């Protein structure tokens, strides 16, 4: 079908991630239906015929190839899940398409705070720039680029599902707690460390991909003061 240039949709039913690099390269549309249950067929038809605008996001990373996965017998977190994977994903954690488009802008938060501050506000504007009403899952991730201990490449710290009519824009507010900004040291103690924290907000995780353009906005927060221990 694909070779004959017949418009084709690959409907995939799976309980977890699969290696589908050939399909991603050659099939113009892929719908992951997971396990839809009794009314799964109706839901798939509603999406395919445009009666429902999809807004689902991946709860797992779709890797480009099996070799990207760590050895099954290794319990080291290096390379596991979106939090520690440093390669290029086929489809990243948090990714999902819609029949409309969303644009992120005006990411605002304090540029510097003390390590002991309990709540730090983050605001971002999301606009539906397409021609169809739809829902978006706004996701906030943080990373610690200058830490010398093992920390995640990125970590989800908040998300909100919003509904926007075509052309509508909304300002979304998150609040980052001390625990959100903390790291766990080699002794298992959770601490807020002085230094830079990168904040990224968008429609998926801010990781390198083979197929999906990165649509996030980012800023940086400077934490000053002494190390603040949360768990004692």
Language model regions located:
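Secreted, periplasmic, or luminal enzymes acting at the cell surface/secretory milieu
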Residues: 4, 11-135, 141, 194, ...
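Intrinsically disordered, low-complexity Pro/Gly/Ser/Thr-rich segments with frequent PxxP/GP/PP motifs
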Residues: 148-184
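Short, conserved secondary-structure segments in the cores of folded domains
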Residues: 110, 158-160, 188
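Cell-envelope/glycan interface and biosynthesis
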Residues: 1
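Intrinsic-disorder/low-complexity, polar/charged segments enriched in Ser/Thr/Lys/Arg/Asp/Glu/Gln
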Residues: 119-121, 169-173, 216-218
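Short acidic, flexible loop segments centered on an aromatic residue
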Residues: 131-148, 154-156
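Terminal connector regions
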Residues: 177-231
């Amino acid at each position: 079908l694909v070779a004959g240039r017949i418009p084709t949709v690959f409907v995939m039913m799976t309980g977890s991630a699969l290696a589908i690099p050939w399909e991603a390269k050659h099939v113009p549309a892929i719908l992951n239906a997971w396990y839809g249950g009794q009314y799964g067929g109706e839901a798939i038809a509603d999406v395919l015929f445009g009666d429902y605008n999809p807004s689902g996001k991946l709860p797992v990373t779709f890797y480009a190839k099996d070799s990207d996965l760590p050895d099954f017998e290794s319990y080291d977190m290096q390379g596991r899940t979106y939090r520690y994977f440093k390669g290029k994903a086929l489809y990243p954690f948090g990714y999902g398409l819609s029949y409309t488009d969303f644009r992120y802008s005006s990411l605002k938060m304090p540029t510097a705070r003390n390590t002991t501050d309990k709540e730090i506000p983050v605001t971002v504007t999301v606009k539906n720039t397409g021609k169809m009403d739809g829902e978006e899952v706004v996701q906030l991730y943080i990373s610690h680029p200058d830490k010398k201990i093992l920390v995640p490449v990125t970590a989800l710290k908040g998300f909100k599902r919003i509904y926007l009519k075509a052309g509508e824009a909304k300002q979304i507010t998150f609040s980052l707690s001390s625990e959100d900004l903390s790291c766990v040291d080699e002794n298992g103690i959770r601490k807020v460390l002085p230094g830079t924290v990168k904040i990224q907000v968008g429609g998926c995780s801010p990781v390198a991909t083979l197929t999906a353009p990165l649509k996030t906005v980012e800023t940086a927060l400077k934490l000053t003061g002494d190390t603040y221990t949360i768990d004692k």
